[in-house]
């Protein structure tokens, strides 16, 4: 079977389109009415089941491994910022390519902990997930953290962050810019106890103030940056650098996939992390994955002399000057 994740906060027309596109044989739900329960039951009542309905069931047949590494495994919808959301087709190979990178990430966390917190002998790490399960960032954690014997702490709402992190000690978490700023204020104002031992906030490299990140690193936090997208199954680049010069970087490319910066500055990725394509949309797939297998991310990047990559903007936002020069408004804004 193929797993399809859905965002319950979308409008019914959006969900109706996505469900209709994938034509499911079974829909599992938690029984909560998110504003479209009546429409869901009217349209899909015969295949609608409670989330826990499987616990009393018996398999209809013996389960054998009949799937290939490159067969479709999961469908995840993109945000749809450029129109209707697209269903990204991900395979087993995609997930295990990314899982390999995440295992390296966990080992880097342990190395940091042994060096900077030698008094803490507990090597069972915990990850606080505030992103929903339909988000690839949390979904991939379900593969990696339990396999390592580590804890995954799930929170359902950003507004409950301080309550939940107090109840569930966590070493690491992926953070949005607003939350990183809140963590920074807690540390600078002597309120670090509110974070209950959190020491590895992980961000998306294009969004944060480098000086703020460097200051958090000086205060004893391990700052990591991750670049990835649904179309690469979350794989991309991870930055472990803690110095102010490189801390805002997306990091150095690893050996899990290939990376290049095209002549127009667009970051391209090729390898086992790249999606199978967009479901039922070969034209859209051809627009982003070329004949040589390179995924064109739509993000602009540059690399410094030491091999660190920096995300500088979006290709679609480029301003073309009269001289023919391409200028990224995001990069221009930072200079101003």
Locate each region found by the language model:
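Short beta-strand->loop structural element characteristic of the AMP-binding/adenylate-forming
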Residues: 1-26, 86-89, 149-157, 224, ...
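Conserved AMP-binding/adenylation subdomain of ANL enzymes
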Residues: 96-126, 133-197
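Conserved S/T- and glycine-rich ATP-binding loop of Class I adenylate-forming
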Residues: 72, 78-81, 127, 132, ...
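Conserved pre-ATP/AMP-binding loop-to-beta segment of ANL
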Residues: 58-77, 83-84, 94, 110-126
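Conserved ATP-binding/catalytic segment of the ANL
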Residues: 253-262, 266-321, 326
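Gly/Ser/Thr-rich phosphate-binding loop
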Residues: 171-175, 184-245, 258
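Structural core segment of the AMP-binding/adenylate-forming
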Residues: 2-62, 66
């Amino acid at each position: 079977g193929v797993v399809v994740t859905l965002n319950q906060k979308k409008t019914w027309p959006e969900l109706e389109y996505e469900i209709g596109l994938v034509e499911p044989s079974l829909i599992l739900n938690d029984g909560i009415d998110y504003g479209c329960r009546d429409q869901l039951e009217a349209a899909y009542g015969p295949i609608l089941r409670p989330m826990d309905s499987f616990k009393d069931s018996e398999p209809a047949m013996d389960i054998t491994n009949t799937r290939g590494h490159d067969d479709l495994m999961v469908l995840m919808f993109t945000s749809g910022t450029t129109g209707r959301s697209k269903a990204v087709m991900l395979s087993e190979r995609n997930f295990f390519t990314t899982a390999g990178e995440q295992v390296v990430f966990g080992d880097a966390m342990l190395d940091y902990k042994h060096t900077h917190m030698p008094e803490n002998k507990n090597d069972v790490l915990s990850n606080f997930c505030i992103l929903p399960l339909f988000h690839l960032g949390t979904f991939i954690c379900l593969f990696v953290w339990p396999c390592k014997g580590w804890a995954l702490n799930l929170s359902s709402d950003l507004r409950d962050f301080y309550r939940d992190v107090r109840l569930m000690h966590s070493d690491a978490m992926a953070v949005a810019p607003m939350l990183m700023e809140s963590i920074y204020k807690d540390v600078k104002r002597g309120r670090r106890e509110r974070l209950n031992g959190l020491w590895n906030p992980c961000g998306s490299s294009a969004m944060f103030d480098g000086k703020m990140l460097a200051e958090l690193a000086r205060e004893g936090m391990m700052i990591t940056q991750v670049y990835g997208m649904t179309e690469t199954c979350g794989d991309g680049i991870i930055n472990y650098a803690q110095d102010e010069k490189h801390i805002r970087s997306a990091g150095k490319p690893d050996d899990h996939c290939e990376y290049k910066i095209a002549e127009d500055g667009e970051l391209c990725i090729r390898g086992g992390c790249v999606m199978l394509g967009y479901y039922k949309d070969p034209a859209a797939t051809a627009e982003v994955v070329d004949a040589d297998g390179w995924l064109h991310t739509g993000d602009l990047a540059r690399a410094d002399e030491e091999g660190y990559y920096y995300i500088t903007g979006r290709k679609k936002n480029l301003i073309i000057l009269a001289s023919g020069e391409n200028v990224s408004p995001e990069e221009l804004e930072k200079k101003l």
